[in-house]
């Protein structure tokens, strides 16, 4: 039997929504000052929320695909949906990340280095160790290409992992008679 689900529309809609919500979440973190919080607990919480947003949209896309496919779904189909949704969102977030780090907050990487330096200083590192570490971080500032590719790769890998997990839970093979 052929698949009736409209793959392109499902992944495009959910990928665009995930990318848009991801940007809105990043703007919210920036506007509230939580982006540079320095609190480990807050950092963990914001990461968990970010992952939950991805799970929500990828699970929704997989369920829509399954519903459009007469209730049937293979793990491979779920992975395909998850990866494509993740890549579409990743492309959107990649453009935003480049815009953010070059126009909105061009001091982003220096702020990140300063935050890490504060945390390491609190752990008791010597001034010399801190200087060596921050100098190394500054030398390895990502290029625009790396800044662009990071969300794209993360989106694809995240979609792969989430698609596999969600697909394993929601799979329902067609009868082979």
Language model segments and positions:
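Short, charged juxtamembrane terminal tails flanking transmembrane helices
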Residues: 1-5, 170-177
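Transmembrane alpha-helical insertion/packing segments
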Residues: 1-61
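Alpha-helical transmembrane segments of multi-pass membrane proteins
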Residues: 9, 13-17, 80-89
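Alpha-helical transmembrane segments of multipass membrane proteins
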Residues: 21-29, 50-54, 89-93, 97, ...
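Membrane-helix interface/capping segments
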Residues: 60-77
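Functional transmembrane-helix hotspots
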Residues: 95-123
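Short membrane-interface loop/juxtamembrane segments of multi-pass integral membrane proteins
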Residues: 119-142
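Individual transmembrane alpha-helix segments
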Residues: 136-157
């Amino acid at each position: 039997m052929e698949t009736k689900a409209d793959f392109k529309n499902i992944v495009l809609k959910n990928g665009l929504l995930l990318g848009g919500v991801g940007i809105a979440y990043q703007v919210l973190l920036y506007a509230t000052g939580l982006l540079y919080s320095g609190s480990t607990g807050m950092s963990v919480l914001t990461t968990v929320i970010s992952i939950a947003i991805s799970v929500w949209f990828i699970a929704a896309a997989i369920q829509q695909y399954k519903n459009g496919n007469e209730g049937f779904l293979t793990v491979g189909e779920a992975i395909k949906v998850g990866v494509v949704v993740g890549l579409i969102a990743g492309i959107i977030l990649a453009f935003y990340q480049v815009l953010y780090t070059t126009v909105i907050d061009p001091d982003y990487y220096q702020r990140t280095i300063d935050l890490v330096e504060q945390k390491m200083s609190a752990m008791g590192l010597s001034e010399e160790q801190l200087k060596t570490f921050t100098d190394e971080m500054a030398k390895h500032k990502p290029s625009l290409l790396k800044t662009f590719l990071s969300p794209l790769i993360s989106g694809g890998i995240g979609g792969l992992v989430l698609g596999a997990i969600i697909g394993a839970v929601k799979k329902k093979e067609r009868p082979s008679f």
